[in-house]
């Protein structure tokens, strides 16, 4: 559930609708700026970020909405996930974000696509302090062009030059 395209009222509505439909796994993410996507002229919303969305989920689970109104019926219960970029240039910044997300209620993490296993292993050595499961993101690039596109347009993903060269050679 990305915060980029919806305000808090819409996000809360999406969460309550998901609960009514029996969807109980929620991956909370801020989302990339619209300039990075295929509609760069669109205005992003970003009323909430991933941490405040996790807080919102916990609030709904307590039986209260963002307006302070009590929910009717049984409050929803979600399995709350968040995103982390283990191959980021700033591992310490990612760990600090991870800590804030855990404090906000994240129960598991999904990584951005990992193309540098050594960096991922080093990250996980530090991230294990949080005691939360981490699911590694895997993308198999179909071409050098796809890998280059991800490097240029997808935040938190870096396909190493060596892999780009291998993909170019595998035409």
Q: What are the functions of these language-model segments?
A:
Residues 96:
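Active-site loop of classical SDR/Rossmann-like NAD(P)-dependent oxidoreductases
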Residues 1-9, 78-93, 167-171:
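Active-site mouth loops of central-metabolism enzymes
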